[in-house]
């Protein structure tokens, strides 16, 4: 029996924030994969090495965690006043499934630099030295992201002294602005607060009823108080990810929260929407030891946040969830805001398993409705490898 030979596709492997993924230009994909559909999904699954019953992604580029099982497709933007269209695919590890329902905030930090380096940004918009402003249209959620990319001698400056908890080595700082991050009316769960409330009573059969802030900003997120579900907010990955019953409870919270947010109609549909919504728990500041062994002092943070992604506690914090945290913290009365001490806030520094992160948001109330014009945070990005990725020619 003859076997199809491997084909090679231009690709770049990039770390963005505390995640990494395989980046493609749309024009470089095989023709069948240049349009959404089964062929594209099958190709990306094979590139990453999924589905893998061993959950290791040994036969692909994935790293067997939600932070490293990611793909990005970029193209010159068809949107006026934008430079690049950015499409993100979260690849399941043990299932044949690519989730297109949300963005990756961490990889957003790498979009601007990749767009510049791969010729997707007009040369006239790139200074010889200074900072390039890349206008990104995030296709998954229909929102604008502005990336401020440092440039030296006409090239992207990746090295620097900006340190990011969850990333071992320093790099150049990339500031990101997430414009109008809240959901638009009628889109995926409605407005910023889909239920119309800052805090709801969320009933989860078999788990309990507890207070929850259901917010759609950056990414749909369900925030609950750590103490209401038996946690302190200082937990590291092993405390959650090694507890199968805990993960089942969190998935139940996520599924019932998704129904309340209007993202799905029935809880059993949550399995087909793994990337969104996220579920997170918050607590007031407390001293703890991060996964690196570094002490995080209560006096250095405004609150504690732990968040789950793709069914596991995240090793640091998803960038889009950080947008949700910053947005919710800026609005008095949400659980996030109350955990941070309440009142009006333009920025918070929160503690996560790997350390701390500062995120800001500009919020205002108009006719009784809260709006957020932008959320701001800094990340870094670095190309790890570039060239081609190879897959069997009959795999998609």
Predicted features along the sequence, with ranges:
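A glycine-rich beta-to-alpha transition motif near the start of alpha/beta enzyme domains, typified by
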Residues: 1-396
């Amino acid at each position: 029996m003859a076997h199809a030979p491997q084909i090679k596709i231009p690709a770049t492997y990039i770390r963005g924030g505390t995640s990494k993924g395989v980046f493609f230009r749309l024009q470089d994909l095989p023709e069948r994969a240049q349009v959404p559909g089964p062929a594209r999904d099958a190709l990306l699954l094979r590139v990453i090495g999924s589905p893998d019953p061993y959950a290791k992604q040994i036969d692909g580029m994935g790293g067997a965690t939600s932070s490293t099982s990611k793909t990005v497709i970029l193209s010159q933007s068809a949107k006026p006043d934008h430079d690049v269209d950015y499409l993100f695919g979260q690849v399941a590890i043990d299932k044949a499934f690519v989730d297109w329902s949300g963005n990756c905030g961490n990889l957003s930090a790498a979009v601007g630099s990749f767009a510049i380096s791969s010729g997707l940004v007009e040369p006239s918009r790139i200074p010889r030295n200074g900072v390039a402003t890349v206008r990104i249209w995030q296709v998954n959620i229909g929102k604008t992201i502005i990336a401020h990319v440092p440039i030296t001698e006409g090239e992207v400056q990746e090295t620097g002294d900006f340190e990011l908890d969850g990333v071992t080595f320093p790099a150049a700082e990339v500031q990101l602005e997430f414009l109008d991050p809240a959901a638009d009316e009628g889109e995926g769960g409605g407005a910023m607060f889909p239920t119309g409330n800052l805090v709801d009573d969320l009933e989860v059969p078999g788990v309990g009823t507890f207070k929850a802030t259901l917010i759609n900003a950056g990414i749909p997120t369900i925030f609950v108080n750590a103490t209401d579900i038996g946690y302190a907010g200082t937990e590291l990955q092993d405390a959650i990810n090694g507890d199968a019953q805990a993960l089942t409870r969190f998935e139940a919270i996520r599924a019932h929260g998704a129904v309340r947010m209007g993202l799905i109609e029935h809880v059993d549909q949550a399995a087909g929407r793994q990337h969104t919504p996220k579920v997170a728990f918050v607590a007031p500041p407390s001293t703890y030891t991060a996964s690196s062994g570094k002490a995080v002092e209560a006096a250095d943070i405004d609150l504690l946040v732990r968040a789950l992604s793709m069914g596991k506690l995240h090793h640091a914090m998803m960038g889009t969830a950080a947008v949700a945290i910053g947005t919710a913290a800026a609005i008095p009365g949400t659980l996030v805001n109350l955990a941070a001490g309440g009142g009006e806030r333009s920025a918070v520094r929160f503690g996560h398993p790997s350390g701390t992160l500062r995120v800001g948001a500009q919020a205002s109330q108009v006719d009784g409705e809260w709006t957020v014009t932008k959320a701001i945070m800094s990340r870094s990005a670095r190309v790890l490898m570039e060239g081609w990725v190879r897959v069997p020619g009959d795999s998609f």
